[in-house]
Amino acid sequence: MSQLEHNIGLSIFEPVAKHRANRIVCTIGPSTQSVEALKNLMKSGMSVARMNFSHGSHEYHQTTINNVRAAAAELGLHIGIALDTKGPEIRTGLFKDGEVTFAPGDIVCVTTDPAYEKVGTKEKFYIDYPQLTKAVPVGGSIYVDDGVMTLRVLSKEDDRTLKCHVNNHHRLTDRRGINLPGCEVDLPAVSEKDRKDLEFGVAQGVDMIFASFIRTAEQVREVRAALGEKGKDILIISKIENHQGVQNIDSIIEASNGIMVARGDLGVEIPAEKVCVAQMCIISKCNVVGKPVICATQMLESMTSNPRPTRAEVSDVANAVLNGADCVMLSGETAKGKYPNEVVQYMARICVEAQSATHDTVMFNSIKNLQKIPMCPEEAVCSSAVASAFEVQAKAMLVLSNTGRSARLISKYRPNCPIICVTTRLQTCRQLNVTRSVVSVFYDAAKSGEDKDKEKRVKLGLDFAKKEKYASTGDVVVVVHADHSVKGYPNQTRLIYLP
């Protein structure tokens, strides 16, 4: 059946899926930092708690981490914790009077001369990027205050100064962000603040880093180096926020553990109408190689102050699911919004509805046909297990995986049932929260003293499937694991009727 034939058969009157495949990342802020508020978010569907290090002190984020862990422990859940770096930025300096109002047609000079750093005026103000005059050509654009004000470069006055035409009315205040669309920007991946924040994150045992403004694969490696030996197991999710990141996406995906399509800054750096194309392309590339991908920014933004989303926002979330995103993310909606629980519940319901419109077997075949032959043995076993799950209409898949690699490989092939991963590592439980369809179960090997008893772990997973109503007595569950003679990858697939 083709995708078109599948779409024709869709019905709003059919029951929705029993499980939600897509995961939800929630930004934690004043509206949701308390233990009680976090418990409500978790009950509503939050999978990962995001801390935005562009705001707040280490003490503030320490409180968030403690509260997330306390709330998760009370509910018996494994919630991932993500540190979102501020990243390298270009900003204006200070204005002599604190602010300046510009009108269309005004002429202003922007300079990298430190003498103007704290004394900006309507005629001339400072930008803290030394390579500005080399990066932006005559005729190019400078976006000020996250793109709200646009300058067109008229001429290069000297090695530090550009003369610009103001395109629109705007009141500009101190330390506003600068974007240079279409320009090659040479900034370090890890600022001094980022370095301190990453050290803090490693010390606190965060599960993943959302690395901001990644432009090249080398910058991903810089972030990895900054995490050091103690942070070697932390996932790096690279945020694509500019045209260089889009241009170098293949190598960035290869160097990263996952990708975030950060549509806010991306929609400033490239034309807004091209963001949908970039989103679909990036998500598809991640799907083919099996890397988790998050779609973020303005997904249900109206719910920051309204109890219901707009129809366009509902379609936006659904479209991200249809594109193939593993996760969808909420920012201000949960950090400072009036309706944090409602927005997560809405997002969860939208994701479940959108699942019904995905043609899983078409996705499976498309991904498999794009793989290089020969496959590695582990991937061959996992892809064959997914094929079996489709053929027997399995209600769940069960995999034993300490690192989570096998669970991610199974997820890559997009089975239309939940993937239950039994693991002996708590960090793996939390990190798998950015991978589509995966639900983790912790097996405490130290407590049981049965680290090598695979049948006990299989039983734990089957009992969990029954308890959580993923499957019922008589349903088929596909089980993937290694036998005792093989180390490092699974080599067995079993079909079990749930007792």
Curated annotation (Swiss-Prot):
SUPFAM superfamilies: Phosphoenolpyruvate/pyruvate domain, PK beta-barrel domain-like, PK C-terminal domain-like. Keywords: Allosteric enzyme, ATP-binding, Glycolysis, Kinase, Magnesium, Metal-binding, Nucleotide-binding, Potassium, Pyruvate, Transferase. The record marks 239 as: Transition state stabilizer. Mg(2+) binds at residues 241, 265. InterPro entries: Pyr_Knase, Pyrv/PenolPyrv_kinase-like_dom, Pyrv_kinase-like_dom_sf, Pyrv_Knase-like_insert_dom_sf, Pyrv_Knase_AS, Pyrv_Knase_brl, Pyrv_Knase_C, Pyrv_Knase_C_sf. One of its GO terms (molecular function) is pyruvate kinase activity. Its cofactor is Mg(2+); K(+). Pathway: Carbohydrate degradation; glycolysis; pyruvate from D-glyceraldehyde 3-phosphate: step 5/5. Substrate binds at residues 50, 264-265, 297. K(+) binds at residues 52, 54, 84-85. Belongs to the pyruvate kinase family. Homotetramer. PANTHER family: PYRUVATE KINASE. This is Pyruvate kinase 2. It comes from Trypanosoma brucei brucei. The gene is PYK2.
